[in-house]
């Protein structure tokens, strides 16, 4: 037995070394043009210079990093297998044995509430946190369509754009306020969700993804070319900002203002903090709404449809209504986020709603874990903060961003907090008992 264990460990170590060597070779080939060779200006002429020590350090770091990563992954897999063999608990006991998720959620909420107070003098931090919350809200909206209903949507940014332009037009053309336009914009985007969902009822997988991708591009092209309505490529400017119960965030004047009403000295940070708490309120309401929907029959129908559509139809579930409701609710939540985006920016254009935005939102849902609310929050933090932290490394910013995404998918293939647990393991455990 000892000889067998020793041989297994030797094979595992050899496999790890081979894998790390492969990564080092790939890093060497990619690093020669990116790191090993560079151009320097010498007397007005460009000359090729070499940086072999930096390249060697990069290759060594990749080799050691991959070796360490494989070791950690193997240890985690071994520990998981040991735990599964020793686990005799029922599914309900396993679910209740994760109280740290609840503590993590409450901790994140407390941190979000106190963040503007802790960074009241740092507008950049509050602005970045506001951007994170926008993507959290978008991720929760797309999570209804992709994570719960299992419908791959590559054009989700279209609903984001419809909500933003609806508020922009209602506020600039008709003088509507933020809270007046918010439910109307949600209804408009929900109707667009039904409009998209109706012709795609019989489509699945890749075909559905292609249709939704085309829908997103159609919306963007319409916004670019319909200049009378959308302003074309120039967009819509002078969009009113939301106020605090009618009190604008302006310097004191003849009209009552927020600072004057509360006896404060005027500061531009007041509006930034107010917008942060506003999107935090919208995000919390979105979370409560989606969590409640998941407990209702419609939410259970979404998840059942995701697992096996044919079985759902055999049980009498109306697949058409289930799909349309997922598209409509997901679109409505994206429209709410679009309304806030337009109100925050004061200016929107079609360039704000490209396919890249859809890809980022989908990546947030996938990396966070399909169907996981808290996972969407963590993935939004990673995907929004990484590019911000990499601004000082402009040359390697996207390289670091892509490497982080790859590492997350290697470490957690089901997402940071995978919601879908394999049921067969519990069934086999019950059968064994």
Where in this protein do the model-derived segments appear?
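Conserved kink/hinge residues within transmembrane alpha-helices of Major Facilitator Superfamily
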Residues: 139, 193-194, 205, 338, ...
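Membrane-embedded alpha-helical core segments of multi-pass
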Residues: 133-141, 162, 191-192
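Membrane-water interface segments at transmembrane-helix boundaries in multipass membrane proteins
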Residues: 2-134, 164-187, 217-305, 313-329, ...
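Alpha-helical transmembrane segments of multi-pass membrane proteins, especially transporters
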Residues: 160, 185, 212-213
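Short, non-helical or kinked segments that cap or interrupt transmembrane helices
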Residues: 145-163, 202-208, 347-354, 373
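Hydrophobic alpha-helical segments that mediate membrane insertion or helix-helix packing
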Residues: 200, 311-312
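Phosphate/pyrophosphate-binding loop motifs in nucleotide- or prenyl diphosphate-using proteins
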Residues: 308
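Short loop segments and helix-boundary regions at transmembrane helix junctions
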Residues: 10-15, 145-152, 190-229, 369
